[in-house]
Amino acid sequence: MADKKIKIRQIGSPIRRPKDQRKILTGLGLGKMHREVELVDTPEVRGMIRKLPHMVEVID
């Protein structure tokens, strides 16, 4: 059984953001503008995305 995936794209710059927001971006595997990453859809990943609605968008 395959795990459900979620695809996200970074739309906000980490420059002049609080350190905790930059760490969350790094934890999601992002760091540069317009990069996309595909992650396993878990409650932990969803929570990280919910903390950064102004910096990431869900594609899939």
Swiss-Prot record:
Family matches, as Pfam families: Ribosomal_L30 (PF00327)
Molecular function as annotated in GO: structural constituent of ribosome
Keywords for this protein: Ribonucleoprotein, Ribosomal protein
GO biological process per UniProt: translation
Entry GO terms, CC: cytosolic large ribosomal subunit
Subunit field text: Part of the 50S ribosomal subunit.
Family affiliation: Belongs to the universal ribosomal protein uL30 family.
Name listed for the protein in its UniProt record: Large ribosomal subunit protein uL30
Organism: Sphingopyxis alaskensis (strain DSM 13593 / LMG 18877 / RB2256) (Sphingomonas alaskensis)
Protein encoded by which gene: rpmD
